[in-house]
Amino acid sequence: NGAYVTSEFADKLIKTLPYTPIKGIYDSFNDDFSDHGARRAEGRIYGIVPENPNFAWEEHQDSDGVTRTYGCSDVLIFSALYEEANSIVGKAQSMELYTPSIKGSWQFINGKRLYVYTEACFLGLQILGEDVEPCFEGAAFFSFCDSLKGLVENMERFNLQFEKTSEETQMIVNYKLS
């Protein structure tokens, strides 16, 4: 989309993350979320970033094989209010910036004309549908609980496989999840 985010700008932007709404436009005909919409006022608020978002930079390998660094935080999803909110985990995510807060300039970087942000604040974190590509390849809502369950399942499969392939060898594996 022609945007260039420096680490200095990212650090400033993250400070505006608390209380940012989780926004979405749900299309009941297609049973999925859509895009940003024609106007930013479309859709519903499906959640919020808490005051203390537990923010961290994390590396994730995207489906294209490239490892990228993403900003991750806790969010509260209003799943009891809206049935469709239960399908948010796994959906792509895009950030929306508050237009009057945006400052920056167009610059050529590596032969490409890009908008380099210097100031902005969050307006929302937008839930995207299956057919909508996010600005940042692997940006998505995920559940730590689901990730942890997957890790435990993988460890259990490893143990079963190990027991089958090495009846004579005994190995003790201790896990500590914290």
Regions picked out by a protein language model, each given a short descriptive name:
Residues N1-M171, Y175-K176:
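Signature of dsDNA virion morphogenesis modules
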